[in-house]
Design a protein with these regions (language model features):
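Short, Lys/Arg- and Gly-enriched loop/turn segments at beta-strand edges
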Residues: 25-35
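Helix N-cap at the beta1-alpha1 junction of Rossmann-like dinucleotide-binding domains, i.e.
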Residues: 111-114, 144, 167-168
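Glycine-rich beta-strand-centered segment in the early N-terminal region that forms part
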Residues: 1-24, 51-53
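A short acidic, Gly/Pro-enriched loop at the edge of an enzyme's catalytic core
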Residues: 129-137
């Protein structure tokens, strides 16, 4: 975003492009970290100044942070073998997994257009995946009902990391998931 107002004792200027990691200082939206808020009020020291030419790509810092956080949550188990969702977050997660773990992952994506643009990893419609041995799965799809479809592809004792931004409460058929355990 851009600074619209600042105090005299700060090292930022009105109009400066900035990134605000993990802010809870939203003023008009009560949501996850205020990411959908129109404005945020934060101490100047929390701001990360961005080059003017960066445009809106600075938002990728937040998504990369989310992708890295999801990978850290799974680090004792290993990188995911399946990533659900090929939006910006899913693409970052796949690329970070490949770069950091030298592991090629499979990504599920239900939208045909979003299945395009992979760089060395496989992107499938979930209905095309015949595997039933996924040990580590990371969902970044935002689809609150994807677990029922995914659980049938899990190996016994698989781990699911939920790292998407869901518009509705996550729901799943507990008996089917329990039977995979």
């Amino acid at each position: 975003g851009s600074v619209v107002e600042c105090g005299a004792q700060t090292n930022v200027e009105v109009g400066q492009r900035v990134f605000i990691p993990g802010s809870r200082g939203f003023t008009d939206v009560h949501g996850l970290f205020g990411g959908a808020a129109h404005s945020l009020v934060v101490p100047a020291e929390r701001l990360v100044k961005l080059p003017t030419e960066m445009e809106s790509t600075g938002v990728l810092l937040a998504l990369a942070g989310t992708a890295c956080h999801a990978l850290r949550r799974m680090e004792d188990l290993g990188p995911p073998d399946l990533i659900i969702g090929h939006g910006a977050l899913g693409r970052l997660l796949a690329r970070i997994t490949e770069a950091g773990h030298h592991k090629t992952v499979t990504v599920w994506e239900t939208g045909a257009v979003r299945r395009e643009g992979s760089l060395g990893y496989t992107v499938l419609d979930p209905s095309e995946d015949t595997r039933r041995d996924c040990q580590r799965v990371c969902d970044v799809s935002g689809a609150h009902d994807i677990i029922d479809q995914a659980v049938h592809h899990f190996a016994r004792h698989a781990t699911l990391c939920l790292a998407g931004f869901y518009a509705a409460p996550i729901q799943f058929n507990f008996p089917a998931a329990f039977m995979r355990e």
